[in-house]
Amino acid sequence: MLQTLYVIAHTFFKICKLELGPQDLPNSKAFLLLVAVVYMGISTIIPILFEIPILKALLQTFVEINITFFLTFSLLYLTGHYSRIMKTLTAIIGVDIFFHLIALPILLLELYFKSISVDIGLAQILALLLVGWNITVYAHILRHALSSEFFVGFVITFVYLLVTIVILQSFFPISPEALTP
């Protein structure tokens, strides 16, 4: 069991290092479902850290994962890469788990600094670097899924990001007070 978890985690880590792509994952509905369930659990924790009620956090995560499913399905179906949908979704959701796990200590560091009224910007810099890495990995995954150049994957990643932000903001608006330190 631990060996299997190690292999899975190592595979997603290699995707994050741009060494593997979605084509290196199994084409399995059960594996996609497992990855999606783990993602739902981990992604629900982060909003709770910021005192968002658990039901709202679950709903937000549910909406977010459905956006990912819809955008990925639409993109690959419309470009004639229907057979790559399951592997691509598994890759995107799996690397999101990885990035959420890395983000947790950064967010906890930020909360700690806020609790002692210190702002050195370290958590923000780390978070920005993490977002940049996440965008790069998404572009890498989409490039492989579409058999295209990295630039194409990069542009599509920004469209994904924009659409996701707009939809999430329409369902779960962030008040201006929440953005002020």
Show the residue positions of the predicted features.
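Selected alpha-helical membrane-embedding segments in polytopic membrane proteins
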Residues: L2-L89, D96
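A general structural signal for short secondary-structure boundary/capping elements
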Residues: L5, A139, P173-I174
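A generic structural signal for ordered alpha-helices
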Residues: E19, A36-V37, T44, P53, ...
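Short, exposed beta-strand "edge-strand" segments with a Pro/Gly-rich flavor and a Y/T-containing core
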Residues: E19-N27, I141-S148, Y160
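Junctions where cytoplasmic loops transition into the N-terminal start of transmembrane alpha-helices
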Residues: F31, T157-L161
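Juxtamembrane/disordered regions of integral membrane proteins
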Residues: I46-E51, L107-E110, P176-P181
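Hydrophobic alpha-helical transmembrane segments and adjacent short intramembrane/lumenal linkers
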Residues: H81-V155, V163, I167-L168
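Juxtamembrane boundary at the C-terminal end of a transmembrane helix
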Residues: I165-P181
